Amino acid sequence: EREVVLGHAIWKREWGGDPSIVGKTILLGGAPWTVVGVMGPEFALPEQKVDLYVPLWVAYPVAAPERGVHFLRSVFRLKPGVTAAAARADLAGVFAELGRLHPESDKGLNPDLVPLLDNVVGDSRRSLAILIGAVGLVLLIACANLANLQMTNVSARNSELSIRAALGASRRRIVSQILVESALLSVLGGALGFLLSAWGVGALLSRFPEALPRLGNVGANLRVAGFTFLASLATSILFGVAPGWQAASGRLTGLLGRARSGALRDGAARGALVVSEIALAMVLLVGAGLLLRVLWRLRSVPPGFETRGVLAAHIDLPQSRYDDKATQSMFRRRLLQSLNEQPGVSAALISEIPLSGDALDHDFVIEGEPPIAPGDEPSIYTRSVMGDYFRVMRIPLRAGRLLNEGDRESTEYVGVVNESMVRRYFPHSNPLGRRLRWARQREPEWITIVGVVGDVRHFGLAAAEEPAVYTPYVQSARDWKRWSELVVRGPGGSSGLGELVRRMVRGIDPLLPIARIRWMDQVVGDSLTRQRFNAELLTIFAASALLLACVGIFGVMWSTVRRRRAEIGVRMALGAGPARVVREIVADGLRLIALGIGIGLAAAFGLTRLMASLLFGVAPTDPATFVGVALLLAAAAVLACWIPARRASRVDPMVVLRAE
């Protein structure tokens, strides 16, 4: 019986959240299905967006007898008190028994039991750790700026606080006041940041909906708001202590000379904070620069086929009307014939398109090679093709011939291998004419290698191609394997190609849905989604750090200029020109900048090694990135110094001296 459970999203989208849909019949692929339930909004499969849940053996009723086909993954919930090690031991015993009962298909199989979280996060864990670290560095820079601001504020209020201390205000009261002011600034900044994050997360999800696992579940909610409030409060207290202690120190009650000497010491403290800001910004800028360099390199990597003007459409034939190879092959032949009859259009089919990440692999045996123990056989990725696939995709032929219409179910089983297959398994021999078969077949079917084609980046532009064999669809298809990818090359990438594909499909089967249609250029771009996400997000953090560091050095230099107004006025009255004043003030700032950049370079040299797994074709210590970032940061920081220096050079010496 065909029963289906609706996902929450499609229930809301297509049926408006109507609870009466339960028990009713809907048409899926032209066949009636009974709705028996609706999933809650909180449920989602770890790696996929799913709208409909159906019984496995209804969707694939003939898959069970083919024991050599292993394409399913299981999810277990451990009983209370059962450890992962115990579960692995139990599962190993089950697989050993399966191998004894079915040696031709299951002998040598080893289960891999991993925590679901590890399976979901996978290689994203390092990216997440780096992004969290980047957030922490930006927070530290912001906190240093807050401390700098408060120390400048305390220095400006020196007279007021000295009088209050002289009149009996306790140290605790003065420290409390400064801490309250810091907390107010931090909480207001945190509130503004939360509002910006609510907007930023929406923009991020619209641009990168699937860059990381479960990214769609990220949002600015009450828990995030509470964390933001507590983090703002904690940082205000932590980084408000130094200004508060300065405000309550005994030197505030001193004479003017002592106050000025204290101001000099405070200036040194603020300078140290600025140096730390520049160093932290340097680390973030280097990290962002490396990821941008990686992205630039990946975009120049040839995928192994020509993407321009090629459209890909996913076609999944419903089991209710296409339950055997004959009906499936008839549909595919008619579709290819209809499309290839259109002027300037060429079409073909393949089991999985390049860069999709989807692939089927088989353990295999090469004829004439020494026997290999069951379970130790090498594996190879298999791709079933139909039509003139290699010419549609313009994948170069290196040796032998391509697959053609003469390769039928009744003829010799043949295959075309890629160059990676030749390099790994036939490094010193001619692969043409050699035969291979799948391991664990009840009735072995030998595949003769008739051609060699160029490598195609199937698993990503950063991933090297693995050994693969292309076989004719009619020779490799199974009754249960009803999905395929249609690839169509049109005249000059015609914008109407997608509508043409839909029209041709509807002409053969009006009820058949097409899940997705994408240009291959888009497929290539989508394969870089995670790299673009990492690079752009870290660049945003680095730009924020650069801005904060420049604000910090601007504030320190502005405070320095204000403190030295009398000195500058005297020097200008004695003949010092504006240019000399600017040079000397900028030189003071350059000392801080050089020290910060030096410390930042040393820190980045060590920390960027943690990013090695995210880098492709770029060394963690890439000299061009380090030098370029150092020059960028130096230029921005010098500009932040020049503005207050320029203002100082324009003061009227007589006005300053009269004020003093």
Q: Where are the model-predicted features located?
A:
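Interfacial "coupling" helices/loops that link adjacent transmembrane helices in transporter permeases
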Residues: 142-186, 264, 551-593, 597, ...
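Alpha-helical membrane-protein architecture signal
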Residues: 133, 171-176, 180, 223-227, ...
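C-terminal transmembrane helical bundles of large multi-pass transporters
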Residues: 462, 500, 504, 508-601, ...
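Conserved G/P- and acidic residue-centered "switch" motifs that form tight phosphate/ATP-binding loops
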Residues: 7, 37, 145, 168, ...
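Small-residue-rich transmembrane alpha-helices
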Residues: 147, 183-252, 290-293, 588-647
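Mid-to-C-terminal secondary-structure elements
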Residues: 2-129, 202, 291, 316, ...
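Hydrophobic alpha-helical transmembrane segments of multi-pass inner-membrane transport and secretion
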Residues: 124-159, 234, 238, 268-294, ...
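Alpha-helical transmembrane segments of integral membrane proteins
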Residues: 116-121, 149-176, 180, 200-322, ...
